[in-house]
């Protein structure tokens, strides 16, 4: 479908869509008010699981990627039950430590290739397949958004105590969102591995975490399409800017994150922000009031109408 694009452009587009999947993985937990910094760790789990199955066990590509996503989801479920009882900064630090444990473990095990990573991964995922997966995930998100699960997650985000008082099992839905986030991050890791053909622990760095977190904060937690479009827009803009240095990218995204948190803390898809912008655009312009054309009529008298 995208054969008219040159190989480099297809590779860049695939990387942007992988980032979109990672942003969606954060969008899931944002729905219930959870700030998870373990996304990169789950991405590494999915990438290494699928790559090892393909290179060592000779699994086909699609089952290997699916298995990697499932392993990441299982790990998210297990460890999510341990850290999701935390709140605020403690939850953020707990999930960050969890993600770093996964990455450091991968870097130090010999059967994962150690610091050198894994090479020789089959490169047989097309850009069209990745586009289809992102759209399919979006359709699922829309269905969940309209379901009771989506309403429960949003209720938890607004006020946990009120949600619990309404009969919503807060712990269960937070764990469900964390598990789904791990699945999407593992899926993104698998697709990236089969797009580049090589992976190493250095890919899952703090700089990448800052980039994905910045994209997620810019998009906000209200519209899944906003997450995808933000990832695409920033990715395309980055290509035009031509920034390739990791430190420069980290500074760029970090500064962007600070600006967004100050100006639009709820993201650009915040309904209140959109309503204000729409109201200002549609509100009619009122010029200076014109002086009355006739004197007020006496009490009880009808005004004079001139035709």
Predicted regions and their residues:
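Transmembrane alpha-helices and adjacent helix-loop boundaries
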Residues: 1-307
């Amino acid at each position: 479908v995208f054969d008219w694009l040159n190989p480099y452009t297809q590779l860049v587009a695939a990387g942007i869509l992988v980032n979109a999947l990672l942003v969606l993985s954060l969008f899931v937990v944002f729905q219930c008010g959870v700030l998870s910094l373990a996304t990169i760790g789950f991405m590494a789990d999915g990438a290494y699981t699928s790559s090892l199955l393909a290179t060592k066990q000779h699994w086909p590509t699609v089952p290997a990627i699916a298995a990697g996503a499932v392993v990441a989801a299982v790990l998210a479920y297990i460890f999510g039950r341990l850290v999701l009882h935390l709140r605020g900064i403690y939850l953020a630090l707990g999930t960050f430590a969890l993600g770093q444990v996964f990455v450091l473990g991968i870097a130090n095990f010999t059967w994962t290739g150690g610091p050198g990573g894994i090479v020789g991964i089959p490169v047989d995922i097309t850009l069209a397949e990745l586009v289809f997966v992102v759209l399919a995930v979006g359709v699922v998100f829309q269905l969940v958004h309209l379901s009771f699960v989506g309403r429960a997650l949003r209720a938890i985000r607004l006020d946990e105590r009120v949600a619990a008082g309404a009969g919503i099992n807060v712990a269960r839905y937070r764990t469900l969102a964390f598990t789904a986030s791990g699945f999407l991050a593992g899926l993104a890791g698998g697709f990236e591995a089969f797009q580049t053909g090589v992976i190493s622990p250095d890919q899952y760095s703090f700089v990448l975490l800052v980039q994905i977190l910045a994209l997620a904060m810019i998009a906000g937690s209200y519209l899944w399409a906003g997450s995808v479009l933000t990832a695409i827009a920033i990715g395309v803009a980055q290509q035009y800017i031509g920034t390739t240095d990791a430190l420069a990218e980290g500074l760029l995204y970090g500064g962007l994150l600070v600006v967004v948190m100050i100006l639009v803390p709820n993201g650009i898809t915040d309904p209140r922000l959109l309503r204000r912008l729409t109201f200002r655009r549609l509100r009619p312009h009122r010029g200076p009031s014109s002086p009355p054309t006739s004197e007020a009529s006496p009490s009880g008298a009808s005004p004079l109408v001139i035709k």
